[in-house]
Amino acid sequence: IGKAANTVTNSPSSITLNTSARTATFTVNRKGNGTITATSNNTSVAKIKSINQSTGVVTVESVNDTTGTAKITVKVAEGTNYKAASDTTVSVTAQFVTIYGVEWDWTSGGSTRGKRTDAAASFGDPSPAVNNGSGSSPFDGKMPWSGMVKETRAGGVEVKEPKYWFKWTKTGKKLKLQIADGPVAGFSVDPVNRDRGDGLGELDYSYIGRYHCASGYKSATGAAQQVNITRSQARSGIHNLGANFWQMDFAQFWYVNMLFLVEFADWNGERIGRGCSTSNSKMNNGQTDAMGYHTGTTAASRDSYGFTQYRNIEGWWDNVYDWMDGCYYNNNGLNVISNPNNFSDSANGTLVGTPSSGYPSDFTIPTA
């Protein structure tokens, strides 16, 4: 008498790993006593911890809390009374990181507004403060946004910049930006906290001044801003505060702006307010100190000129012009300098693109 055919099913056919369940199980339902083996096709995400040959229970465990997917292939060998069974699979989803995104579709237009994606898909619009009042945002309590808190340090009042991971994707006329609160395959560490070749390595957080630099090049409230200076003067003056103090640069610019883009799903900064001095002349730092929320305008209306702040950074656009380091133009186009030790007005940069005239209508994603 020959051996009978075997039929195998797995219950459940998909499992999830996360911070609440770093291991998960499924049961292999088979006929007879054929030996069960199981292998993962992505051992950087999930691996087999154990197999109980009596009960058919397979235990799968996370690998270093890595977010991603894997497929477990189950094999049942020939047993005493049954033939070897056909392979079956179980899907594994490991979610230890939250991803927030926004996508713009410029196929038939050029709107500044985008559509929220990923974990932000169901979020409503933030409500920044008006007239120094209160405000709210669905991103409050979500890292890295919630980590942008004020601290008094050697450079004055500064705002903490926690590390995040990001990814730009371009498909035809669609542009997508995603920000994650942990490492994800295919994502990059933010421009400020990544290893910039300056000897500090990858950082967990950095800082940016809450205010424009005042006397002594520090970030101080109630003080007048440094104006009518060159970029190189600002560079040296700020760097004199300490070995790791640098003028706001191209990396800082994009660190903050990417957070804004995902939070507001809009390229229009005036969603917060019109940033401009109310008197057509500069006014001292600290105009937003009385604001009851980290983001908003001092004006009675968002359509009126006042003083603005975003995530505790005052004057991201208003009152005075800013120098930005770490970039320069030459005949070839825009050059970017990653290592702050190499900041220069005309050298040491990597060419990232050639701008065209007029307002931007599309973007490319540089690979440099």
Write out the residue ranges for each language-model feature:
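GGW-centered surface loops in extracellular recognition modules
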Residues: 96-160, 166-168, 245
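Enriched for extracellular/lumenal, surface-exposed ectodomains of secreted and cell-surface proteins
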Residues: 74-85
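Extracellular/luminal low-complexity segments enriched in Ser/Thr/Pro
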Residues: 55-68
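Solvent-exposed, low-complexity, repeat-rich "mucin-like" stalks and linkers
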Residues: 1-40, 93-96
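Low-complexity "stalk/linker" and mucin-like segments enriched in Ser/Thr/Pro/Ala/Gly
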Residues: 41-58
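Short aromatic-cysteine micro-motif
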Residues: 153-155, 181-316
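Short, solvent-exposed loop/turn segments enriched in Ser/Thr/Gly
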Residues: 19-26, 65-72, 87
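Short, conserved beta-strand/loop elements in beta-sheet-dominated catalytic cores
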Residues: 163-165, 243-248, 252-254, 291-368
